[in-house]
């Protein structure tokens, strides 16, 4: 439900093609996905970057392969596939906030409140005046930087962080294999999309371990 409500807020982004945001860097990621489609499944070499370099040295693979797979499967232009990918995981991330708060507090009301806050506002605007002034009609910062500046990979990595933390919390609490596996997959998804997101996860993780509930004894 949280995912669907968030999708309603950003519905135009799911079908967007080329935007008029000239400060955006998203054309780089769209071009990468198009290059990957034309040289599927692995180009090995990218002649257009740094006077030529290995394709896997350029950027984490998650967004490029995700965009390429959507374009190939749905017949979308790479630009539309890119926006679908980033919009989907933006909504996924808001649902992830709900999951993290629900797991940590056991409160459905608190989880809904935090998810709504993440979707509708940015507390940083209270303290960071330049960011507040840069935001169109106080659009949430995470959505603004994705649309205006093309930070799709960064925001996708950020979307996976609450999922990774929620399942890590459950893994520390229960020691069961399922949450451990889901936590590992979510952490891998963070790193696979953006290294800044991976850095944020590395900062949050010790805090999570410090605040995680006492481990339950393992059942015989």
Feature names for model-found ranges:
Residues 1-9, 185:
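Alpha-helical transmembrane segments
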Residues 167-188, 217-220:
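Short hydrophobic alpha-helices at membrane interfaces in multi-pass membrane enzymes
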């Amino acid at each position: 439900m949280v995912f669907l409500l968030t999708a309603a807020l950003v519905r135009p982004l799911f079908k967007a093609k080329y935007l008029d945001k000239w400060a955006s860097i998203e054309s780089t990621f769209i071009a990468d996905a198009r290059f990957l489609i034309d040289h599927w499944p692995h180009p090995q070499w990218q002649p257009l970057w740094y006077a030529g370099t290995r394709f896997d040295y350029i950027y984490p693979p998650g967004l490029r392969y995700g965009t390429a797979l959507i374009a190939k499967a749905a017949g979308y232009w790479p630009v539309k596939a890119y926006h679908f990918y980033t919009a989907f995981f933006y909504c996924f991330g808001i649902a992830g906030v709900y999951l993290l708060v629900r797991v940590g507090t056991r409160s459905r009301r608190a989880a809904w409140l935090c998810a709504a806050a993440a979707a509708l506002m940015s507390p940083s605007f209270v303290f960071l005046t330049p960011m507040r002034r840069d935001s169109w009609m106080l659009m949430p910062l995470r959505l603004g930087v994705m649309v205006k500046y093309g930070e799709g990979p960064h925001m996708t990595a950020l979307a996976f962080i609450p999922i990774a933390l929620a399942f890590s919390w459950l893994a520390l609490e229960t020691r069961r294999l399922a949450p451990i596996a889901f936590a590992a997959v979510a952490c891998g998804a963070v790193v696979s999309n953006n290294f800044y997101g991976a850095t944020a996860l590395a900062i949050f993780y010790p805090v999570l371990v410090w605040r995680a509930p006492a481990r339950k004894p393992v059942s015989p």
